[in-house]
């Protein structure tokens, strides 16, 4: 009976030697060691033999099973290694070939302008404050000394939202980020030095206006703050932002409900060429003023002890002036060609201003 074991051994080893892939190898393994395999069938026949013969036959079958199991496992490892080497040869990469071009995104001009403004004011000691886009009328208007009859409160200029808040007031999409200034003065003790960039909303839409746009407002509250501090801060910002150390800057008397005195700020430019800092024309870029005493009082600050100044500017407007962008609506059209042209590399710093 040993002859049949030798035949099974030789046939199995020969089949393993000829196996070329995992499927052939697995068929041999199942056909030999599986539940219906040849060796398993011989083991099942042991019960029919006499005790002494069963003992000898069983020992021989166990030795054969161990031998074939080891041979099958070894051949399986060899087949896997051969398949790996074949795949590596077929997938060989020539590292001397040029890498495929990678299309990278760009930083949106609005995001980059906010980064630049944050860096410049950060070097002056300002921090960034944020607030909700949906405001109460008190934070958006009343606390800022804006009277009930002011045209900014009408639905022609402001988006009102239902339902009313817990005080019965209709909520609004903020028309300015000044509400952040109010929240900061209510929640923080002076001295305060913040800027508040963010989205604002007004019912207007044309080449130079959008129903949603971005503003950056600034606030300084401290003792003995004067108009000279305001002028020095804004002149420094504008000259660094436009990279014009001698940029002409002019302050004109104006009116805002929340500042007194109030001033519009103009920069020198050429109307004919659009050059910033050139020519004899003036271009308005932002509004500013000393914080109105009523605004300070509304926030629990004594106007006799604390003074301050505030300013606000349109982020899109500054981005358009600096980068030669002609139409405000282009900022929101998601045109990849426009973004590639006016966008900024993510690997370049926003500004070289010290303190970033």
From Swiss-Prot:
It comes from Gluconobacter oxydans (strain 621H) (Gluconobacter suboxydans). It comes from the Bacteria. It is an enzyme of class 6 (ligase). Tetramer of two alpha and two beta subunits. CDD domains: PheRS_alpha_core. Gene3D superfamilies: Bira Bifunctional Protein, Domain 2 (3.30.930.10). This is Phenylalanine--tRNA ligase alpha subunit. Its cofactor is Mg(2+). Belongs to the class-II aminoacyl-tRNA synthetase family. Phe-tRNA synthetase alpha subunit type 1 subfamily. It catalyses: tRNA(Phe) + L-phenylalanine + ATP = L-phenylalanyl-tRNA(Phe) + AMP + diphosphate + H(+). One of its GO terms (biological process) is phenylalanyl-tRNA aminoacylation. GO terms for cellular component: cytoplasm. PROSITE patterns: AA_TRNA_LIGASE_II. It is found in: Cytoplasm. HAMAP family: Phe_tRNA_synth_alpha1. Mg(2+) binds at residue 260. GO terms for molecular function: ATP binding; magnesium ion binding; phenylalanine-tRNA ligase activity; tRNA binding. Keywords: Aminoacyl-tRNA synthetase, ATP-binding, Cytoplasm, Ligase, Magnesium, Metal-binding, Nucleotide-binding, Protein biosynthesis. Its EC number is 6.1.1.20.
């Amino acid at each position: 009976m040993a002859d049949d074991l030798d035949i099974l051994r030789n046939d199995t080893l020969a089949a393993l030697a000829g196996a070329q892939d995992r499927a052939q190898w697995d068929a041999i393994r199942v056909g030999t060691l599986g539940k219906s395999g040849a060796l398993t069938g011989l083991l099942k026949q042991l019960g029919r033999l006499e005790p002494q013969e069963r003992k000898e036959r069983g020992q021989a079958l166990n030795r054969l099973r161990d031998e074939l199991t080891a041979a099958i496992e070894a051949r399986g490892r060899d087949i896997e290694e051969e398949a790996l080497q074949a795949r590596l040869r077929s997938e060989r990469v020539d590292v001397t070939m040029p890498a495929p071009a990678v299309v990278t995104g760009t930083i949106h001009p609005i995001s980059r302008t906010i980064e630049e403004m944050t860096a410049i004011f950060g070097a002056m000691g300002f921090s960034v404050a944020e607030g909700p886009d949906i405001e109460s009328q008190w934070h958006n208007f009343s606390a800022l000394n804006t009277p009930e009859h002011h045209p900014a409160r009408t639905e022609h200029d402001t988006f009102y939202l239902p339902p009313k808040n817990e005080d019965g007031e209709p909520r609004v999409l903020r028309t300015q980020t000044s509400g952040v200034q109010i929240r900061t003065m209510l929640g923080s003790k002076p001295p305060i030095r913040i800027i508040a960039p963010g989205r604002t909303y007004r019912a207007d839409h044309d080449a130079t206006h959008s129903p949603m746009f971005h503003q950056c407002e600034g606030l300084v509250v401290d003792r003995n703050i004067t108009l000279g501090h305001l002028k020095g801060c804004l002149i420094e910002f504008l000259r660094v932002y436009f990279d014009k150390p001698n940029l002409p800057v002019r302050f004109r008397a104006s009116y805002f409900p929340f500042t007194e005195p109030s001033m519009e700020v103009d920069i020198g430019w050429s109307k004919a060429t659009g050059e910033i800092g050139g020519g004899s024309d003036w271009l308005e870029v932002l509004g500013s003023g000393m914080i109105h005493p009523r605004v300070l009082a509304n926030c629990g600050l004594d106007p006799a002890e604390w003074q301050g100044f505030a300013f606000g500017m349109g982020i899109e407007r500054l981005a358009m002036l600096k980068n030669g962008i002609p139409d405000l609506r282009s900022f929101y059209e998601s045109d990849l060609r426009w973004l590639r042209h006016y966008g900024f590399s993510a690997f370049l710093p926003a500004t070289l201003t010290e303190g970033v």
